[in-house]
Amino acid sequence: MSTGTGSLTALQDCGVLQQKVPLAEFTTWRVGGPAQWLAEPTSTEQIPELLQWARERRLPVHMIGAGSNLLIADGGLPGLTLCLRRLQGSALNADTGRVRAAAGEPLPTLARRAAKAGLQGLEWAVGIPGTVGGAAVMNAGAQGGCTAEQLISVDVIRFSDAQPSLATLSRDELAFSYRHSALQSNRHLVVAAEFQLEPGHDPAELQRLTSGNLNHRTSTQPYKLPSCGSVFRNPEPEKAGRLIESLGLKGRAIGGAQVSELHANFIVNTGDASANDIRALISLVQGEVMEAKGIALHPEVKRLGFETPD
């Protein structure tokens, strides 16, 4: 597959491919510098063409969804940034409980649709500010539930091959563990996922449970300020938020980044935070917890564009 100037021009003309786009608006923390190239494909068919175009130019490729659990450097990202938030849509079978969703489908939207159809299993997901694709990659979870419990398979585009190719991976191939999957370390781009939910439940009851879960999250977590969601994985059996709070770190700030006064496992952007502010505050919290408790906190956050890894 060779991508000539004609197809490139067509992608630019329809707004799929753009240059020097600020990425702050693409992350829930509202920080991050510009993408050298940003692509927002509207169909799965456009993705192999974009990947091949980047490969022919030896450009690095970065993948983002809704931008939660993501910290992009102030200097931005070189190469091609693929954002899949426009790849939306889902199909639910109320009789069998089978659900198929595009990678960019917002997880709360899917959770509400499932509840309305009487399909049990995604009530926990209603307050997670991410996409189906991101949930599969991170094994997102909340309130005792997680993606791995309902996911059957994912459709991926392999871009490590000579030519980008489509494949389907089963749950067993994804090696799920707490907030982790094999998708975090391979060259696969999730474009769709399939779930098995439990059919035949009362939609009104499921919607009540879903609303209750959302109300609990919005009352205990800082939804009024930009954040990425939970910053650190829980070092079981401990809870990261409780450890941080026990050290009096709620309200601690560096620049415009602050440990939330409402929930200590959240770092919020109070208005003028930079990615460097947030990164420094993450390191500060890790250091304080290690010194006082001897416990290493590991971020859930994916960091892109930084010169040195944490």
Swiss-Prot record:
Residues 30-200 form the FAD-binding PCMH-type domain. It catalyses: UDP-N-acetyl-alpha-D-muramate + NADP(+) = UDP-N-acetyl-3-O-(1-carboxyvinyl)-alpha-D-glucosamine + NADPH + H(+). Its EC number is 1.3.1.98. InterPro entries: FAD-bd_PCMH (IPR016166), FAD-bd_PCMH-like_sf (IPR036318), FAD-bd_PCMH_sub1 (IPR016167), FAD-bd_PCMH_sub2 (IPR016169), MurB (IPR003170), MurB_C (IPR011601), MurB_C_sf (IPR036635), Oxid_FAD_bind_N (IPR006094). Pathway: Cell wall biogenesis; peptidoglycan biosynthesis. PROSITE patterns: FAD_PCMH. Its main location: cytoplasm. The active site is at residues 179, 230, 300. Keywords: Cell cycle, Cell division, Cell shape, Cell wall biogenesis/degradation, Cytoplasm, FAD, Flavoprotein, NADP, Oxidoreductase, Peptidoglycan synthesis. It is found in: Cytoplasm. GO terms for molecular function: FAD binding; UDP-N-acetylmuramate dehydrogenase activity. The keyword Cytoplasm applies. GO terms for cellular component: cytosol. GO terms for biological process: cell division; cell wall organization; peptidoglycan biosynthetic process; regulation of cell shape. Its cofactor is FAD. Cell wall formation. PANTHER family: UDP-N-ACETYLENOLPYRUVOYLGLUCOSAMINE REDUCTASE. Belongs to the MurB family. This is UDP-N-acetylenolpyruvoylglucosamine reductase. It comes from Synechococcus sp. (strain WH7803). The lineage of its organism: Bacteria, Bacillati, Cyanobacteriota, Cyanophyceae, Synechococcales.
